Amino acid sequence: MSRIGKRPIEIPSGVKVSYVTPILKVEGPKGSLLREIMSDIALEIEEKSVSVNRADDAIKSRSAHGLTRTLINNMVVGVTKGFEKILEINGVGYRAEAKGDVLSLSLGYSHPINFPLPKGITVEVDKMTKVFVRGIDKELVGQTAAKIRSFRGPEPYKGKGIKYADERILRKAGKTGKK
């Protein structure tokens, strides 16, 4: 039995969970999310909890058991609290600016990068060097933050580029050169 999969998911007040095979819908104060559930997984929806069970002990079912439980829990947390990733921009002349549903980045290239934000994602820029990526879908927030970071990842010599706020960059010593 999966240690993660066997734990029930608590449903807070104000959250509504409905399941019409194979689509699970979670609605809350911040919005609603849909996810397709594998046919090998069975859901038991009660008043204040959701239990995830597997139909058989096949390898595919066992591997999806804990994953499905975690994905559903992330949906519940997303519609109640939401998710956030913080990116920091380091470097001379590197800056970000939010213009509606487009994030404009100046990262030392000959042209600015205009990144269109996916639906359901909001971006807030603080002092042109901190970017807050927020949304209710954890997967989409992480994916969007990773795409923004990929435009100019941090380099190990001076630490210039875009990095996550909690990320630690291992610095390298430069060449010593001939003397």
Swiss-Prot record:
It comes from the Bacteria. Pfam families: Ribosomal_L6. Keywords: Ribonucleoprotein, Ribosomal protein, RNA-binding, rRNA-binding. PROSITE patterns: RIBOSOMAL_L6_1. GO terms for molecular function: rRNA binding; structural constituent of ribosome. GO terms for biological process: cytoplasmic translation. GO terms for cellular component: cytosolic large ribosomal subunit. The keyword Glycosyltransferase does not apply. NCBIfam families: L6_bact. This protein binds to the 23S rRNA, and is important in its secondary structure. It is located near the subunit interface in the base of the L7/L12 stalk, and near the tRNA binding site of the peptidyltransferase center. Belongs to the universal ribosomal protein uL6 family. Part of the 50S ribosomal subunit. This is Large ribosomal subunit protein uL6. It comes from Geobacter metallireducens (strain ATCC 53774 / DSM 7210 / GS-15). The lineage of its organism: Bacteria, Pseudomonadati, Thermodesulfobacteriota, Desulfuromonadia, Geobacterales. The gene is rplF.
